[in-house]
Amino acid sequence: MGEPITGRLSADSGVKFVSASVGVDDDRFLIMNTGGYGYIAEYKNMISNKKSGRAFMRLPENAEMLKAIPVRKNHTHIAAVSNIGKLLIFEIDELPILGKGKGNKIINIPKDKLAAGEEFMAHAQLLATDSSLRIEVGKRFVTLKPKDWSEYIPVSYTHLTLPTKNE
């Protein structure tokens, strides 16, 4: 069932489709990549009337796009996590609204570690002021309520690390 997306779009060889989004002009989405960069985009700037699409995000070398996340009016914070357990929570207003570009650094990923595949931004989640964030690692998990977020919201814009099993 269904229709191949390549019937509607002409993509270069090796292009990987990561996400599909539906919205109206003023809807907003968090656009980000594994290199740790991202920005907020309005839906009207995400649309192309050309079959070949359009340049939308400049990727750092060796980075890949992550799934676009719809931004709702009640979302106030972004929680970003790397594959090695770094967690950063910050206010959504700290990210710019752009039509295209590289965006701002969401979480620090060293270029050499990204190139080697050792470290990358794995995921981000949008949070409302009454949200709880559940982080699962294997069979273990931790739930962070808003009162717990301050530990992961830096005074200066740098990343913090979750304690590991050995600490």
Residue ranges and their predicted role:
Residues 1-167:
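Short, structured "edge-of-domain" segments at secondary-structure transitions
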